[in-house]
């Protein structure tokens, strides 16, 4: 086992009766990194988390933590902690006792428990609130207590099971920042599960996208968005306008509109016909252009931070996302589009 691969799943399968939920999965998490499992409901991401935790046993395959085979090891012996979607706090205990519960189970000295609990409450900005009870604090504060309860045990691995799904948008944003800051500060190897792409991108070093119990693609958030490996990935990672076009002689030809090919986009690609994807933010509208660039503006929706614009170009409806400085309210229904070469990706027709 390589030293920097702290959590490793090797050829893991999980079946419930005749239903295969995880199919020959290989996964590696480097020490101190945060890896997120992202995917639609039923893709198997939560099952993987439960396998790492020891809440489920694999049908076949092996699981290693810190070089040790823990495939058949109980959850109590794995030195991991989990932060749940439901918080799982004890309503009859004070916040102090909730955070210190695991330490008491370890029968640590009272003075050490007090110091570690006080430190943990300070980390999550809840100092001085230890004597309150769960029903006296907000949902965001409850999630901070759940996080403090995990951190106070100083686990080898920290697991997050959709921890922010019960919070409103502003609290989710704040808690994303808190989780990422504390994870990096303490260099805790972490596995995070969510169905929210924005959340995954905000907290992760690496994102692993799953579908039907298998890994579809993994990489940095930037890599997954800019270079999807399949049509599923292209659409799952955000809106995409898909064309049939050609890469030839350093240019991309889409509906007769020739665009200089960005070297990073076409790196390793042979010349030929492709499915060409263009992200909505890579298309701009102007009042002048070549005939091949002419389009019809069908609809404009103000979204606060941006405008979503629907246009028809060569009988195909496209989605554009323009910020306020890019959108001209005086633009006529007949406009011209330009495409930023860096917002393009190429896929073979069988992807």
Swiss-Prot record:
ABC transporter domain sequence ranges: 7-237
EC top class named in words: translocase
Pfam assignment, any one: TOBE_2
GO CC annotations, alphabetized: ATP-binding cassette (ABC) transporter complex
Main location: membrane
UniProt key word Transcription regulation: no
Binding site for ATP: 39-46
Enzyme Commission code(s) on record: 7.2.2.7
Compartment(s): Cell inner membrane
Membrane topology: Peripheral membrane protein
SMART domains: AAA
Subunit structure: The complex is composed of two ATP-binding proteins (FbpC), two transmembrane proteins (FbpB) and a solute-binding protein (FbpA).
Protein family per UniProt: Belongs to the ABC transporter superfamily. Fe(3+) ion importer (TC 3.A.1.10) family.
Protein name in the entry: Fe(3+) ions import ATP-binding protein FbpC
Organism (species): Photobacterium profundum (strain SS9)
